[in-house]
UniProtKB/Swiss-Prot annotation:
One Gene Ontology molecular-function label: diaminopimelate epimerase activity
Protein name from the UniProt record: Diaminopimelate epimerase
Native source species: Bacillus thuringiensis (strain Al Hakam)
Described purpose of this protein according to its UniProt entry: Catalyzes the stereoinversion of LL-2,6-diaminopimelate (L,L-DAP) to meso-diaminopimelate (meso-DAP), a precursor of L-lysine and an essential component of the bacterial peptidoglycan.
One GO BP: lysine biosynthetic process via diaminopimelate
Record keywords: Amino-acid biosynthesis, Cytoplasm, Isomerase, Lysine biosynthesis
Binding site for substrate: 14, 67, 77-78, 166, 199, 217-218, 227-228
InterPro entries membership: DAP_epimerase_AS, DAP_epimerase_DapF
Enzyme Commission (EC) number: 5.1.1.7
Gene of this entry: dapF
C-alpha cells in the first residue's frame, strides 16, 4: 500500500487533488491510474482531476495536470490559480509575482495577499493560438478558425477554435441553460478533426462586458468552471466582433465569476479566486 499527502482545492467549483511533489513521491508510471483513482467520487476523494506541484528547472514551480480519466492536460486556468495560492502560502515562492511552468509554456502569476492568505490570483495566460496547427486541428490554413459550421442532429452549430495552451471549441447560443452540453459536448470533444480532443464551451452574450458560460471539459465532462475556457470564450467573442479587445470581461460560470481581458499587447489575463477545501492522506494500491 502506498500513500501521499494532498490538499483538495477548487477554483469556482472546479476541484482538483493537489500533491506537493517537493515532498511526495508517486512513480511516473502510476500517475495516470492514481489520478483516475483519487478523482473517483465513490472510491476515491472525488475531484475533476489531480494536479502535481513539482520542482522546475525554468521556474519556481511546475504544474502537471491530470484529468479524472487519467489523461494529462497541458494547462488549466483554475488549477494555475490554485497552484499560485498553494505555492505562496507554503513558501515555495517568496514574491507575490512569480512564474509557473506548464506543458503549454511558462505563465506569470500575481497573488493578492491578506493576512498571509491568498485571496485572489491573476494569471497572465500568454497569447491565444489561432491557427489549425497551433490548436491543433486537422487541415491547413494560417487564418483563425472563426464561425465554422458543425452539423449535429440536423442543426448547424457555428464554432470558433482557440488554443490557450489547450484546445477549445467555442459556440455562441441564445441561452446556455438550453445548450446541448451533455450531447454535443462529447461528440465534438472526440471528433476526428481534433487529434488531441477538445474542450467545448457554450457562450451566451449578455452585453459588451458580460457573458454566461457553460463547459464540457476534455477528459472530465461537465465541470463548474474552466479558466482556459473562459479565456478562449473572451478571445472568440472578440474575434466575432461581439466584444472589445482591451476591456475586462466578466464571465459568469456555473461556479462563479472570472475577470478576463485580451490586452492590446496580445496576452490574455485571467483573475479569480482559489480556495482550499481540505487536507489529508490518500492510500492506494496498484494491482500488478
Amino acid at each position: 500500500m502506498s500513500q501521499f499527502s494532498f490538499t483538495k482545492m477548487h477554483g469556482l467549483g472546479n476541484s482538483y487533488i493537489y500533491v506537493n511533489m517537493f515532498e511526495e513521491q508517486i512513480p511516473e508510471e502510476d500517475l495516470a491510474l492514481v489520478a483516475e483513482k483519487v478523482s473517483n467520487i465513490n472510491t476515491g476523494i472525488g475531484a475533476d482531476g489531480m494536479i502535481l506541484i513539482c520542482p522546475s528547472d525554468v521556474a519556481p514551480v511546475k504544474m502537471r495536470m491530470f484529468n479524472n480519466d487519467g489523461s494529462e492536460g497541458k494547462s488549466c486556468g483554475n488549477g494555475l490559480r490554485c497552484v499560485a495560492k498553494y505555492a505562496y502560502e507554503h513558501k515555495l515562492v517568496e514574491d507575490t509575482v512569480f512564474t509557473i511552468e506548464t506543458l503549454a509554456g511558462i505563465v506569470t502569476a500575481e497573488v493578492t495577499v491578506e493576512e498571509g492568505k491568498v485571496t485572489l490570483a491573476k494569471i497572465d495566460m500568454g497569447a491565444p493560438r489561432l491557427t489549425r496547427a497551433e490548436i491543433p486541428m486537422l487541415g491547413e490554413g494560417e487564418t483563425p478558425f472563426i464561425r465554422e459550421n458543425f452539423l449535429y442532429n440536423n442543426h448547424r452549430y457555428a464554432f470558433t477554435a482557440v488554443s490557450m495552451g489547450n484546445s477549445h471549441a467555442v459556440i455562441f447560443v441564445d441561452d446556455v441553460e438550453q445548450a446541448p452540453l451533455t450531447t454535443l459536448g462529447p461528440v465534438l470533444e472526440t471528433h476526428e478533426m481534433f487529434p488531441e480532443r477538445v474542450n467545448v464551451e457554450f457562450i451566451e452574450i449578455l452585453n459588451e462586458e458580460e457573458m454566461n458560460f457553460r463547459v464540457w471539459e476534455r477528459g472530465s465532462g461537465v465541470t463548474q468552471a474552466c479558466g482556459t475556457g473562459a479565456c478562449a470564450a473572451v478571445v472568440a467573442s472578440i474575434l466575432n466582433g461581439k466584444m472589445e479587445r482591451g476591456k475586462e470581461i466578466t464571465v459568469h460560470l456555473a461556479g462563479g465569476d472570472l475577470m478576463i481581458a485580451w490586452t492590446e499587447e496580445g496576452n490574455v489575463l485571467m483573475k479569480g479566486p482559489a480556495e482550499v477545501i481540505c487536507h489529508g492522506v490518500y492510500e492506494y494500491k496498484i494491482e500488478a
